[in-house]
Amino acid sequence: MTLGQQAESLAQGYLEQQGLTFVARNVRYPFGEIDLVMRHKHHWVFVEVKYRSANQFGGAIQALSKAQIGRIRMAASHYLQTHKLDVPCRFDVVAIEDAQIHWLVDAF
């Protein structure tokens, strides 16, 4: 299992402990990928997982570029259309740095 896969597993477990329900993982489209799809009450939650072993380059949260955000939004829109879902959604980020988990709800 790669470091990225380990981080996604850790993030998934953490979010499940916080009351979210797992739906899908590593949803890939030619134009973007969604790390985790979760549900929280009536919301569908699209989660980007960022892992950094050290904070020397700005940390995991700063590693998310505007271009990445655009690709995630496009992938989420396609996911909702493909599954014929007309539901509220949000975009969260789980940042894992030095074994600490930071969950940013409605991050973008």
Swiss-Prot record:
GO terms for molecular function: nucleic acid binding. Gene3D superfamilies: 3.40.1350.10. It comes from the Bacteria. CDD domains: PoNe_Nuclease. Belongs to the UPF0102 family. This is UPF0102 protein Shewana3_3881. It comes from Shewanella sp. (strain ANA-3). The lineage of its organism: Bacteria, Pseudomonadati, Pseudomonadota, Gammaproteobacteria, Alteromonadales.
